[in-house]
């Protein structure tokens, strides 16, 4: 298992609330919690930025982290990430924040300590560009959105 440096920014982490951890042996994501001062109600259509109480330093340029929504919040309550996906670069060391967007027509209350998103580590390949005049032909070619069909 890869070791990632984690800084606790809120003393409730590790005391009232656990460190992010994998729920099962097969889990890909670690749950991030809302570490606000008090419960926060998100109005329909509103976007709020919520602290998680931690920062991480990945340090390895072959890794990044993504902050992804929790499926139940989106499906059952209309709560999704305001930026859809949060990308954490390997050299970022600041606090992890979660942008929550209430896309429903009902207010939603985030309680202190609620699991609001998940953190997933992903491999990164940094690429350079080779300028060409033409590409070798493929079956798909320039076919764009919907070109490959539905089934």
Curated annotation (Swiss-Prot):
InterPro entries: dUTPase (IPR008181), dUTPase-like (IPR029054), dUTPase-like_sf (IPR036157), dUTPase_trimeric (IPR033704). One of its GO terms (biological process) is dUMP biosynthetic process. Pfam families: dUTPase. SUPFAM superfamilies: dUTPase-like. Its cofactor is Mg(2+). The keyword Hydrolase applies. The keyword Lipid biosynthesis does not apply. It comes from the Bacteria. Belongs to the dUTPase family. PANTHER family: DEOXYURIDINE 5'-TRIPHOSPHATE NUCLEOTIDOHYDROLASE (PTHR11241:SF0). This is Deoxyuridine 5'-triphosphate nucleotidohydrolase. It comes from Actinobacillus pleuropneumoniae serotype 3 (strain JL03). The lineage of its organism: Bacteria, Pseudomonadati, Pseudomonadota, Gammaproteobacteria, Pasteurellales.
């Amino acid at each position: 298992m890869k070791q990632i440096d984690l800084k606790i920014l809120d003393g409730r982490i590790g005391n009232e609330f656990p460190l992010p951890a994998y729920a099962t042996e097969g889990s890909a994501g670690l749950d991030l919690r809302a570490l606000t001062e008090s419960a926060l109600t998100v109005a329909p259509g509103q976007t709020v930025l919520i602290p998680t109480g931690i920062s991480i330093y990945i340090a390895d340029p072959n890794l990044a982290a993504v902050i992804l929504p929790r499926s139940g919040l989106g499906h059952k309550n209309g709560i999704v990430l305001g930026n859809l996906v949060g990308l954490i670069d390997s050299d970022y060391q600041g606090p992890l924040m979660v942008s929550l967007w209430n896309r429903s027509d009902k207010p939603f209350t985030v309680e202190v300590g609620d699991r609001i998103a998940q953190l997933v580590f992903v491999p990164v390949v940094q690429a350079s560009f080779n300028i060409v005049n033409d590409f070798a032909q493929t079956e798909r070619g320039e076919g764009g959105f919907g070109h490959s069909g539905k089934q």
